[in-house]
Swiss-Prot record:
GO terms for molecular function: ATP binding; protein serine kinase activity; protein serine/threonine kinase activity. This is Probable serine/threonine-protein kinase PBL21. It comes from Arabidopsis thaliana (Mouse-ear cress). Residues 362-381 are annotated as: Disordered. The lineage of its organism: Eukaryota, Viridiplantae, Streptophyta, Embryophyta, Tracheophyta. PROSITE patterns: PROTEIN_KINASE_ATP, PROTEIN_KINASE_DOM, PROTEIN_KINASE_ST.
C-alpha cells in the first residue's frame, strides 16, 4: 500500500550503552567529539529557544530542590508498598509531599544505567521544555551520593503496562485509545523537533517511556539520553550509540550519526507495538519472531496481510480503512533509509486525521460499542 501525507488534510530490561558528553552550547556551536568527562559532570544545555524565547533554568522558577529527608518522608522511608517499578536505573516510588501533592519519585541506583550526566541532562531538559505531552519535573534531590527525580504522578502507569502481559482481569486498550496515545506521543516529539531551537532529539522513545494520565493522555518521560540536534549546515550529530535495543534506527546503530529521523524510526516501532500488542523485542517468541520490526516486514508490504499484524485482543473491533492508514504511516517511519522517513509534523497531521476517522467510525457504530471499560488507577498511599 502506498500513501502520501498530502492526501490526509495537510497543514503547514532495556539495554543501553555508555553516554557520551552532552552537547555544549555556545550560540549553538558544537564540538561533538568525546574527550572524556569533565570534572563536574555538568552538561551545558542552557539557551534552548522555545517560540523564539530563550528558556533557561531559573532558581525557584520550575523544578525545585528537595532534601533527601523530605523525599524519604514522602515515601514513608521508601516502603515497598509504595514501589511502582524498578529497572537498571533504580526504583520508582509513589509519594505524597507535605503539600498533599501525589508524585512519582525516581531513586537512581549509583551503580545503575542512568549516570550523573544523564541525571543532569534530564533535570535541565525538563526544566527548559514544557508541553502537555511531556511529563512535568517537579523537583530533584542531590544530597550526598543520592540522585532522585520527582515527577508528576501518572496514575495509569506506562503504555507497556497496557499493551503487554495483561492480567486476566485487565481490559485491553480500544483502537480509539491507541490512536489517542499515538497522536499525543507524536505531538510531544513534534514539540521537541519543531518548537525547541535547536531541536531536541529524544533518543529513547519506547512504550516504557510513554506515561498515561487518568484520561489515557500520553506524556513522554525519561530525558536522560536526549541530545540537542544539528544546527546550521550540520546534517547530524555524531555520538556514541545509545538507546534501547529493538527501537534504534539502523543507520544510527551502525554509524552513531544521530538526526531527528532517528526518533521517527523509534516512533514507528512504538506505533507498531500499539497496532500489534507485541514487544519490540520479545525473547518469548519463537526464533525469527523475536524482533518485532523484522517479523512485521513481510506483512507491511502486502495489504492483504495487514490483518495478521493486528492485536488479537482487539477482537476485530477496528476500522479496516484506518488500519490501512496506520500501517502506511508505520511503513514510512520504518524505512531503512532515513531521508525517506517523514517529518514528525506530517506524522501528526496524518495521525490526527486517522484518529478523527476512527472516532467517526465508532460514532456510526454506537449500537456495538467498544468493550472499553473504566480502569482502576494505581493504588493510593
Amino acid at each position: 500500500m502506498t500513501c502520501c501525507f498530502s492526501c490526509l488534510n495537510p497543514r503547514t530490561k532495556d539495554i543501553r550503552v555508555d553516554i557520551d558528553n552532552a552537547r555544549c552550547n555556545s550560540r549553538y556551536q558544537t564540538d561533538s567529539s568525546v574527550h572524556g568527562s569533565d570534572t563536574t559532570g555538568t552538561e551545558s544545555i542552557s539557551g534552548i529557544l522555545v517560540n523564539g524565547k530563550v528558556n533557561s533554568p531559573i532558581p525557584g522558577g520550575g523544578a525545585r530542590s528537595f532534601t533527601f529527608k523530605e523525599l524519604a518522608a514522602a515515601t514513608r522511608n521508601f516502603r515497598e508498598v509504595n514501589l511502582l517499578g524498578e529497572g537498571g536505573f533504580g526504583r520508582v516510588y509513589k509519594g505524597r509531599l507535605d503539600s498533599g501533592q501525589v508524585v512519582a519519585i525516581k531513586q537512581l541506583n549509583p551503580d545503575g544505567l542512568q549516570g550523573n550526566r544523564e541525571f543532569i541532562v534530564e533535570v535541565l531538559m525538563l526544566s527548559l521544555l514544557h508541553h502537555p505531552n511531556l511529563v512535568t519535573l517537579i523537583g530533584y534531590c542531590t544530597s550526598g551520593d543520592q540522585r532522585l527525580l520527582v515527577y508528576e504522578y501518572m496514575p495509569m502507569g506506562s503504555l507497556e503496562d497496557h499493551l503487554f502481559d495483561l492480567e486476566s482481569n485487565q481490559e485491553p486498550l480500544s483502537w480509539n485509545t491507541r490512536m489517542k496515545i499515538a497522536v499525543g506521543a507524536a505531538r510531544g516529539i513534534e514539540y521537541l523537533h519543531c518548537t525547541a531551537n535547536p531541536p531536541v532529539i529524544y533518543r529513547d522513545l519506547k512504550s516504557a517511556n510513554i506515561l498515561l494520565d487518568k484520561e489515557f493522555s500520553p506524556k513522554l518521560s525519561d530525558f536522560g539520553l536526549a541530545k540537542l540536534g544539528p544546527v546550521g549546515d550540520r546534517t547530524h550529530v555524531s555520538t556514541r550509540v545509545m538507546g534501547t535495543y529493538g527501537y534504534c534506527a539502523p543507520e544510527y546503530a551502525m554509524s552513531g550519526k544521530l538526526t531527528v529521523k532517528s526518533d521517527i524510526y523509534c516512533f514507528g516501532v512504538v506505533l507498531l507495538e500499539l497496532i500489534t500488542g507485541r514487544k519490540a523485542i520479545d525473547l518469548g517468541q519463537k526464533q525469527g519472531e523475536q524482533n518485532l520490526v523484522t517479523w512485521s516486514r513481510p506483512y507491511l508490504k502486502d495489504q492483504k496481510k495487514f490483518g495478521h499484524l493486528v492485536d488479537p485482543s482487539l477482537r476485530g473491533k477496528y476500522p479496516r480503512r484506518c488500519l490501512n492508514y496506520a500501517i502506511a504511516i508505520i511503513a514510512m517511519c520504518l524505512n531503512e533509509e532515513a531521508h525517506y522517513r517523514p517529518f514528525i509534523g506530517d506524522i501528526v497531521v496524518a495521525l490526527e486525521y486517522l484518529a478523527a476517522q476512527s472516532r467517526s467510525h465508532e460514532a456510526r457504530n454506537v449500537s456495538s460499542p467498544s468493550p472499553e471499560i473504566s480502569r482502576t488507577p494505581r493504588r493510593d498511599l
